[in-house]
Amino acid sequence: MNRRHFLHTAIASAALPSLASAQEVKAKAKKRILLRSSWQTVNIGDIAHTPGMLHLLEKHLPEYEVTLWPSSVDNGVAEMLMKRFPKLKIMETTAEAKKEAFATHDFLLHGSGPGIVGQKSIIEWTEKTGKPYGIGGVTWSGGGTDKGEGVKVISGGKFAFFRDSVSLEMAKAKGATSPIMEFGPDATFACDLVNDEPAAAWLKEVGLEDGKFICCIPKLRNTPYWEIKKGVKFDEKKNARNEEMKEHDIAPLRNAVIAVVQQTSMKVLLCPEDASQMKLNKEMIYDKLPEDVKKKVVWRQDYWLTDFAQSVYNRSAGLFGNEQHSPIMCIGHGIPAIVCRYKEQTSKGFMWKDIGLSEWLFDHDFDEAEKGLTPAVLAIVNDPESAKAKAAKGKAVADDRMKRMMDVLRAELEA
């Protein structure tokens, strides 16, 4: 064999393993993920679950094709998702489209949510396909009256990540036995949707400068869906509970707003997470402020989508209030955020403890916000560098746990 022929043969032989492994990777990459998510569009946090999970998949499993199986992507949400994720396929909610998706996808990933929102979908997937599934970043309160169905669904999954440790312990206590059950934060931490140009223009229009305002969001004990979603009947019991507790729950926010304006140079933005809160902000905070305080408070009168809101939060000094997802969106971008919780919100607020932000968690059921909220808000305003450092630590914990979730998913896809 002459030298040239030897070299050619040797090089070709050496290339074979890499070619083979490349073909194997390509073959594995053909596996498709069906993401069950996008629960509703009247809350920017419920919207944010999906782009957060899509960003994680894009970052950690870029070679896999993803199709979204939504409940709702109306009100401009589909367009917003496609703008950020142009390769995304959104399944039509028809029997034919579902049948095709079931046949052509290999793994069902249930996205983040206030529970196993797509529990019936998981059962249908399992019964019709026998293919694997996993659950990523949910709160779980024990299944309620589902006669053990939730435990079976958790146990049948290849993995189940819970977005707060209380939910994780509940699943264990109820006897759930998925091979991997761990703390895995809400995928909203990974949401990177922004709409900078319109957001910056609006802030200029209302006189808010970057880093010189803090955001505030109120919330009732029960979201009044009868006001913001078609077909939802008025709930007299929930409405009565809202009326009973709204001054108790929102007065600490109002007091913090007044303190910020009177004791610092900061302005305050009263903004919504869901479509009912513009009215709530006006009724319970803005209209009850002293006239001199109102001059440095901006009340946003319109609902907004996740990308616009994120761009505003990113330009703020921080956020506080009775909501959960806007604080998650903030921490995900290194912006300080305080959560005030109560039992009607389920256990999701405890994820603040799980990511090391206990000092920024206040429980209305124990009147913690009444005493501690204003000092905590003022501390963020008066020492922004320390506050941002604390936010960064919380973000790092969330990022690490979300990576773990993606690593587990990859292992299942490549098994």
Task: Please place each PLM-identified region on the residue numbering.
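N-terminal secretory signal peptides and thylakoid transit peptides that target proteins
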Residues: M1-A14
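Active-site anion-handling motifs in enzyme catalytic cores
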Residues: I11-A14, Q23-A415
